[in-house]
A protein has these predicted regions:
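Acidic, Ala/Val/Gly-enriched low-complexity intrinsically disordered segments
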Residues: 5-8, 14-18, 33
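Periplasmic c-type cytochrome electron-transfer domains
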Residues: 31, 38, 54-374
Length: 374
């Protein structure tokens, strides 16, 4: 029951700490959700006879209410989706001319043909220098509580605007430069007008973020797991169902649940014992709250078999190693090789299929004599 005690202590800490009201509410809601998940887990486990081996019990059905199938899109209250906006966002996702040296686009680090990331511990910026964190996948990211490992952007729309201006990433000198590049091409001007009808001057940096965000809100990868959640009980094999039971019994569902199988909360890395060689402060660098030191957004496990290396620093190379370490450092459990293999078998069922037509690189407008370079 130590996890419940931890949740209650964390709740008391948040309640007595001076924090912005909206942020405090957000944290308390996360803690409440975590406690509800734990209560669900303990109720299920305590309901079984003490003489019944958990390995003999089909836990699959019992834990399914903690999950949701993927939607067809992730709506936003302040960014209405329309085809013109989505198509523009796709072009902007692949646009390099807004970067310094015209070398980089969103797709440089978040490659759509490799599940929205680049399989590198750290991604190189426009000068070839490596960043300080691994590039997370853009697939299914719109489902998440926030963006970036530390949650510093509240939405995919806001996230899209960050790397473009980051001197270590795409390196654009200013928002004005990006707007100037886009306005220099009549095809982009027409596309912005179609995407944002009624606006007198739609080519803005904020609308750049909204267009990319609209595109990303349909970057979803349904898998056999979704078919299973929708009622097709034959969608998963018996081994995959067994793997999910092991996943649930181990306690992984405490943080990895919902439509994203993660991505809905923050958690401390090294919850029950210090994570080895952890230098990144994580969430506390954003909130300036020492109580959130070493907290990171819980990653989604969708397509996890395709997105190695793992963690914010790409320090874990294989999925098997990642499963073992999560159990040990987050749940105080030592898994057998058989249990690790079983969980990995389930995780493989979370690999989805990107829409090849939707993610295909589009034709971009031609530069003009007025198109600036940085």
């Amino acid at each position: 029951m130590w996890l419940c005690d931890f949740s209650e202590k964390r709740k008391q800490t948040v309640e007595t700490t001076a924090l912005p009201p909206t942020y405090k509410i957000c944290l308390l809601n996360q803690i409440s959700a975590m406690k509800q998940n734990l209560a669900h887990i303990f109720a299920l486990l305590l309901g079984f006879s003490a003489t019944t081996a958990l390995a003999q019990v089909d836990l699959t059905e019992s834990f399914l209410p903690m999950f949701k199938a993927l939607p067809t899109e992730v709506p936003a209250p302040d960014n209405e989706l329309n085809d013109a906006k989505i198509n523009l966002g796709r072009q902007l996702y692949f646009e390099t001319r807004i970067s310094k040296g015209a070398k980089m686009s969103c797709n440089s680090c978040h490659k759509l043909d490799t599940f929205g990331q680049d399989n590198l511990p750290f991604s190189p910026g426009h000068e070839g220098k490596l960043g300080g964190r691994s590039s997370p996948s853009t697939y299914n990211a719109a489902l998440h509580i926030a963006q970036f490992w530390d949650g510093r952007a509240p939405s995919v729309e806001e996230q899209a605007k960050g790397p473009v201006l980051n001197p270590g990433e795409m390196g654009a000198p200013s928002e004005a430069f990006v707007v100037q590049v886009l306005k220099s091409m009549p095809e982009y001007v027409s596309a912005f007008k179609a995407a944002f009808p009624g606006e007198a001057d739609p080519v803005t940096y904020n609308n750049f973020g909204k267009a990319v965000g609209a595109f990303e809100r349909k970057l979803l990868t349904p898998s056999k797991w979704d078919d299973f959640l929708k009622g097709n009980k034959e969608a998963l094999s018996s081994e995959e169902k067994k793997g999910f039971a092991t996943f649930a019994k181990t306690g992984c569902v405490t943080c990895h649940n919902g439509a994203g199988v993660g991505g809905h909360m923050y958690q401390k890395l090294g919850l029950v014992k210090p994570w080895p060689s952890l230098k990144d402060n994580g969430r506390s660098d954003v909130t300036k709250n020492e109580g959130e030191k070493h907290f990171f957004k819980v990653p989604s496990l969708r397509n996890i078999t395709e997105t190695a290396p793992y963690l914010h620093d790409g320090s874990v190379k294989t999925l098997e190693e990642m499963v073992k370490m999560m159990a040990e450092y987050q749940l105080a459990k030592q898994l057998t090789d058989e249990e690790v293999t079983s969980i990995v078998t389930f995780l493989k069922a979370l690999k989805g299929t990107p829409d090849a037509e939707y993610t295909k690189a589009p034709k971009l407008p031609e530069s003009t004599s007025d198109t600036p370079k940085a």
